[in-house]
Amino acid sequence: PWANGQGEWAEAYQRAVAIVSQMTLDEKVNLTTGTGWELEKCVGQTGGVPRLNIGGMCLQDSPLGIRDSDYNSAFPAGVNVAATWDKNLAYLRGQAMGQEFSDKGIDVQLGPAAGPLGRSPDGGRNWEGFSPDPALTGVLFAETIKGIQDAGVVATAKHYILNEQEHFRQVAEAAGYGFNISDTISSNVDDKTIHEMYLWPFADAVRAGVGAIMCSYNQINNSYGCQNSYTLNKLLKAELGFQGFVMSDWGAHHSGVGSALAGLDMSMPGDITFDSATSFWGTNLTIAVLNGTVPQWRVDDMAVRIMAAYYKVGRDRLYQPPNFSSWTRDEYGFKYFYPQEGPYEKVNHFVNVQRNHSEVIRKLGADSTVLLKNNNALPLTGKERKVAILGEDAGSNSYGANGCSDRGCDNGTLAMAWGSGTAEFPYLVTPEQAIQAEVLKHKGSVYAITDNWALSQVETLAKQASVSLVFVNSDAGEGYISVDGNEGDRNNLTLWKNGDNLIKAAANNCNNTIVVIHSVGPVLVDEWYDHPNVTAILWAGLPGQESGNSLADVLYGRVNPGAKSPFTWGKTREAYGDYLVRELNNGNGAPQDDFSEGVFIDYRGFDKRNETPIYEFGHGLSYTTF
C-alpha cells in the first residue's frame, strides 16, 4: 500500500512528496539501496541526492548504544528495562541513546527490538528485546521509540517478525556450524497467534510513530521475511497503517522484483553478500522500473517513506555526516574502507557523546535489579566485618571490557551479552570494585576470589566471612558468534562456569550467602535456591557500564528494589515447552518451526500446563515492611 501521511505523519509526508517529486529515478533508487558492507563509515549507509542537498543516511547498531564507536555510553539491555516496568525510564533511556546517536552523525538507530519476543527461554537474542509478554514489551518498545525519535534520530523496530531463534537463521551461518540447508528456517504460525503475540508490540511501535522497521532473516510460513507480502503489505502497511520504511536485515534481501512488490523499501547493506559489489537493487531496480517489472509508483513510495521518516523526527535540522568509522579506531584512513580507496582523511573525530547519561544508566541498573529472595539478609549495613566476594562474574574481563569483539566471550562480570546488539564500554564498574569501596568506607575487610573452580579456597574464605556475595552468570547472543559451544542460542538454562558448585561451596560454609545473577534470561536455580544458608538472591540482568554502582545502591539500601521479573523462572527447561529447533527436520530444505503452542509461551504456557514455577512472571520483593 502507498503511504498516505495519515495522522501525525501528515506534514512529514507532504514534505517527502514535495522533495521526491523533484528526484530522477536514479536518485530515488539511490535512497533505497545501501552502498555496500564496509564501504562507508556506518554499518549501513544509503546513497544520497547531492543535487538536492540530501546526504546519504547513516544506519548504526544497536538497541543498547552505539556499536563500533568510542566515547559513547553502554546502556542496560532491553530485558533490564522490562524488569523496571517503568515507562518513564524506558523513554529516558531511549532519549539518551538518541542524543548520542545524533551527536555521532547517525541518522537511524538499529533498535529497539521486540523480535525475538522470547518464545523460548534459551533464544539467543531475547535480552535485546524486553519480555515474552507482548503487552509489557509493546508499552516499553513504544516509549523507547518515542525517546529516540524525540532526540531527532529515526528508530528501527526489529526484527519483524517471528525471529525467535538463532539456529538456522542464515544459510551461510548454518553451513559454518556443519548444517547444509537450502533456505533459512521457517516460523509457521496461525493468524490468531501472530496478532495476539508477535505482532502486538509492532502495533504499539507503529502507534508510537516509528520511522523504520527491519524485516528478519527467517521465513514466515515458508516465505522470506523481507519478501513476504502478507506480513509487510497486508499486516504492517495496510492493517497497522505503517507510514515509514521497511529495511532488510543485513543479508536478508533475497530478490529484486519480488521483495520490491512485497513491501521492502530499503536494501541493507546493499550488496547481495558482504563486499560482493553486486546488488539486487541499485542499478537492477532502475532496470526493473524501466522494463516494467516494478511499477514506478512502488519506487516513488519507497523514497517517500524514507524521506517522510527523515522529516518526521526532524533529522533534516540535525543532519551531520558521521564523525566516526565503524571499521577502524585510527584517526586517519581512506574514505572507503573495504577497497582502501578514495581520499586519505580524518575518519575518527573521537567525539565524546556521553553527556550525563551515566546517571540514567546507574538508576536503570538499580531499578531493574529483582530481589527474588530475602531472609532479612538485605540491605547490608556496610559494617559487615569480613566480606567475601566470590566468582568470576564479580570481576574484570582479563582482556579488558571491550577485549572480545562484539562481546563474544564470557570473561569477568556480565554486563552485556554478545552480537551486533552491543556497544563499546567507555568503562565498566565491576561489582568487586563497587563493593570493595563500600566496605572500605567502614574500615571492614574484603576479599575476592574470581576463579570459579577454586572451590577449596572459596570454602575456606566463606567459613570466615560475615557475608559471602556469590556472583554467577549465563550468557547468550547472536548466531555468528559461538561461545563455549553456544551458537547464539543457549544450550541449556544452567549457570555458566561451574556456577552451581560455586554457590554450594559458599553456602555450605557460610550461613549468610547472597547470590547475584547476571543473565540474559531465566536460569535454573533448583539446586540451591532453597538452601537455608542462601539468605538472598538478586537478578541484575545485563546492567551496562554502571553495573557495580547500580548493584551497590541496592545491596546497601540506597535504592529499595522495586523491579519485577519480566519472565518466568521454571524448575526445569522442560517446564517451558521444547520450542527451539536445533536439528534439521526437513532434509536439506528449510527447517520447519511450527508454533503449535500458539499463544501459550512463558507464563501462559505454565498456566495452561498447570506447571508451578519457582519464581513467577512479575515476582519481585522489596525491603519495605508492612
Question: How would you label these PLM feature ranges?
Answer:
Residues 1-626:
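Glycoside hydrolase catalytic-domain context in secreted enzymes
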